[in-house]
Design a protein with these regions (language model features):
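Structural recognition of the beta-strand scaffold that forms the well-ordered cores
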Residues: 46, 89-91, 122, 201-204
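Glycine-rich, histidine-containing beta strand-loop boundary motifs that form or position
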Residues: 74, 79-81, 86, 92-94, ...
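Conserved, well-structured interaction surfaces
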Residues: 5-85, 99-101, 105-112, 118-131
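Aromatic-lined, polymer-binding surfaces characteristic
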Residues: 71, 87, 91, 131-139
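Short coil/turn and helix-start
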Residues: 54-58, 90, 130, 156, ...
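Short edge-strand/loop segments of extracellular domains
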Residues: 94-98, 175-176
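Short coil/turn linking the two alpha-helices of tandem helical-hairpin repeats
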Residues: 82-84, 89, 129, 149-158
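An aromatic- and glycine-enriched ligand-binding surface/loop that stacks and positions planar moieties
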Residues: 1-11, 111, 119-120, 133-229
């Protein structure tokens, strides 16, 4: 097995392809833990924003945008988790002394929550925070991907909805994004730090080599990618 910086390169590639095996290794553990840390922060943001808005509405638009971003990122995190591991614990609030451990929830329920969160994100996000932060189109994009996934996975569909229903739902979300972005001329330039948040980017992770020691970006980079090729 190839190694890179002490990490299993094959597992990182498998994670990128959403074919991670359910065997223990440090990359799997880090990805699982990392996504749930993100979810915990989203849960905290959602709860705190609700508390603040109950006390004051001085910046309701800004707080709504924060909550919308949290709902979107939580949906994205669960979409990543359930595609990798199937049934996973569904945390929608911060743990307390009486609620420290959760059993797994069926993937069908996870997808229902993803859809609910993404729809909430669309209703709340307004683009107040500008470049680098998700906008409602990111949630439209996520919903389109979710609906395409459900169109081809009958066991995950909501009762009463068939394949063509989900393809139509995917189209309705995708068309909301159409015309808002444009493709770059040089595909390889998407993976350079000089072309981040380009005209093609609906939403991307804001990773800085100066600010954090993270290899998360490897999971979203083409396999064996080399700069300029």
């Amino acid at each position: 097995t190839g190694k890179n910086g002490g990490n299993n390169v094959n597992n990182v590639n498998n994670a990128n392809l959403f074919s991670l095996k359910p065997t223990y290794d440090i990359d799997s553990e880090n990805m699982w833990g990392g996504l749930y840390r993100v979810i915990a922060r989203c849960n905290g943001a959602i709860e705190n924003v609700s508390t603040v808005l109950e006390a004051s509405s001085s910046d309701e638009s800004g707080f709504n945008d924060i909550a919308g971003q949290a709902y979107f990122v939580r949906a994205w995190s669960y979409f990543s988790l359930t595609r990798l591991w199937g049934d996973v614990p569904l945390w929608l609030s911060l743990p307390n002394n009486e609620n420290l451990h959760l059993a797994t929830s069926p993937s069908k329920d996870i997808y229902a929550q993803i859809i609910s969160d993404a729809e909430m994100a669309i209703s709340l996000m307004n683009g107040n925070f500008g470049t680098g932060y998700p906008r409602q189109y990111a949630a439209n994009m996520l919903l389109a991907k979710v609906y395409m996934t459900l169109a081809t996975n009958p066991d995950l569909r909501a009762d009463g909805l068939g394949e063509m229903d989900y393809w139509q739902l995917a189209y309705e979300q995708a068309i909301q994004v159409y015309g808002q972005y444009s493709l770059v001329a040089d595909y390889s330039s998407l993976f350079t730090d000089t072309n981040e948040n380009s005209s093609e980017s609906i939403w991307e992770l804001q990773i800085s080599q100066d600010a954090a020691n993270s290899q998360m970006g490897r999971n979203f980079t083409p396999w064996k990618y080399k700069l300029g090729q």
